[in-house]
Regions:
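Glycine-rich phosphate-binding loop of ATP-grasp-fold ATP-dependent ligases
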Residues: 277, 298-325
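C-terminal active-site "lid" helix and adjoining low-complexity regulatory extension at the edge
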Residues: 415-419, 428-483
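Phosphate-binding site of ATP-dependent enzymes
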Residues: 314-409, 413
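Conserved N-proximal alpha/beta basic substrate-recognition cap immediately N-terminal to
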Residues: 165-172, 177-290
Length: 483
């Protein structure tokens, strides 16, 4: 959980804050807002530096300590996050957000008992804290106490959990109801809604018992994107959408069919596409003989369901490593995933990302690295002008890079999934096939850093954001014209 200075969805907000900072560089609250805005816009490395600057000026700043710790924790850097999150609790012992994040830290460090104690401390301060109850539910499930887990989940959703954001426009707004899941795995959507044209309400779908619990919208945006992590939330979202009877972007029923194993089966017959074999296997059955019987060979990949950004995702090179690697991953079941070697002759791996909005494809980025697990933020693109030039070519002319067959394959994937907003992470193998790493509704887009070297990445991100905003407005207008 982070502390926010506001909801920043537009680079113009950053420019305004920076103008104010030039006039009043000593104001810590402005420096904190600057850091939050950088984070909201996806400029993570700059945000980390900006939060550190706030802490240097005000050592006990709850927002900077919390947000910097959370950024590091989300990147599996628990050791680096630890001093900040512990300092937040030390400086603000009665702050429930600080203690929730301490519980998350303890769990990441492997001390489940300490994590439970930290969540209990939150409930001593605020007995109805939804994230504390849900955190305890997850921990008690891991410890084999399903009744306790069920009790805390019931308490978490004892009342509707909804938030309405302020509207700053002059004309009647488009009223958007965003459905979210407390279990995580939602699409990062803050850039998609401009508070000058959209009145945004957010509700945790699991907490809704009656339609009267939510504000009447013009359109629903279902942000619940992880079918493996949030199946119950998607089912509740489906019922909400059916009851409201307004257009729903990313129909929950369609999202529910995008789990990793389901995607493998659904895309198996698509021409020009290769989807690595994927099976969900109970930890107790995770043996080399079981994997061999199911058609797996080494090396292979293990992944904990419901995690993204490379978290809890590991390469197993030999059967002898299987038990040790599996022991480092959470969950009682894991995905076993076929390892497809997509390195080129020089040893580089290319991971492309495209997003489809209302059926139209948009290039987002290309990350090039030597590691098998490629992520843009760790690929070292800033250090290679040649790699950035290659990415710029892909962004400018994806069809020229991927070829007609590659574009047809991507279009077929989008058509097969039937989502209004969907992302695809993929490589291209030696045969020219699209090798799908992920295809789902959780794909995020972020503005690039402010340096001139990244200027080529800004237009495609703006195009995606503009397309989503236009889609939302069009769906809302369709309701108004038919009324």
């Amino acid at each position: 959980m982070r502390v926010s200075a506001g909801a920043f969805s537009d680079p113009r907000s950053l420019a305004s804050i920076e103008t104010l900072l030039c006039a009043s560089p000593e104001l810590v609250r402005l420096r904190f807002a600057h850091a939050c805005c950088l984070e909201d816009l996806g400029r993570t490395h700059e945000a980390i530096a900006a939060y550190a600057d706030v802490i240097e000026r005000e050592a006990g700043h709850i927002g900077a300590l919390t947000n910097l710790g959370c950024l590091l924790l989300e990147r599996e850097c628990a050791d680096a996050a630890e001093p900040y999150l512990r300092a937040a609790v030390a400086a603000h012992p009665d702050d429930p957000v600080a203690r929730v994040n301490l519980a998350r830290l303890e769990a990441a460090l492997g001390d489940l008992a300490a994590a439970i104690d930290a969540y209990d401390a939150v409930l001593a301060i605020r007995p109805d804290h939804v994230h504390a109850h849900l955190g305890l539910a997850a921990l008690h499930e891991r410890r084999g106490a399903p009744e306790l887990a069920r009790r805390h989940r019931t308490l978490a959703y004892a009342r509707p959990r909804a938030w309405r954001y302020p509207y700053y426009g002059d004309m009647p707004p488009v009223r958007v109801l965003l459905l979210a899941s407390a279990s995580g795995g939602d699409v990062v959507s803050n850039l998609f809604f401009d508070e000058r044209s959209v009145e945004l309400s957010i509700v945790l779908a699991d907490s809704v018992r009656r339609l009267d619990d939510v504000a009447a919208p013009d359109v629903v945006f279902n942000a619940i994107g992880d079918a493996d992590r949030s199946a119950a939330s998607l089912e509740r979202a489906r019922a909400i959408c059916a009851g409201l009877g307004v257009p729903a972007i990313n129909d929950p029923a369609a999202v529910a069919r995008t789990g990793r194993v389901a995607i493998m089966h659904r895309l198996a017959g698509v021409a020009g596409v290769r989807v690595p074999r994927t099976e969900r296997i109970a930890r107790i059955d995770l043996r080399a003989s079981t994997l061999a019987a199911r058609g797996f060979t080494f090396p292979l990949l293990l992944r904990a369901p419901g995690h993204h950004a490379g978290m809890h995702f590991a390469l197993v090179t030999t059967a002898g490593e299987l038990a040790a690697v599996a022991a480092t991953l959470p969950r009682d079941d894991l995905f076993a995933i076929e390892f497809v070697d997509v390195r080129d002759a020089a040893g580089d791996v290319r991971k492309y990302r495209v997003v489809a909005v209302d059926g139209r494809l948009y290039p987002v980025h290309l990350a090039i690295a030597r590691e098998w697990k490629v992520h843009y933020f760790s690929a070292g693109m800033a250090e290679s002008a040649a790699h950035r030039a290659e990415e710029a070519r892909f962004i400018a002319e994806p069809a020229a890079v991927l070829g007609p067959a590659g574009m047809r394959a991507l279009e077929a994937i989008v058509a097969a999934l039937g989502l209004d907003y969907v992302g695809i992470d993929f490589a291209v193998d030696a045969a020219g096939r699209i090798v799908v790493f992920e295809a789902n509704a959780t794909m995020a887009v972020y503005h690039p850093p402010g340096e001139a070297m990244w200027a080529y990445r800004r237009p495609p991100i703006d195009a995606v954001i503009g397309a989503v905003r236009a889609m939302v407005a069009a769906r809302a207008s369709a309701v108004g014209s038919s009324a």
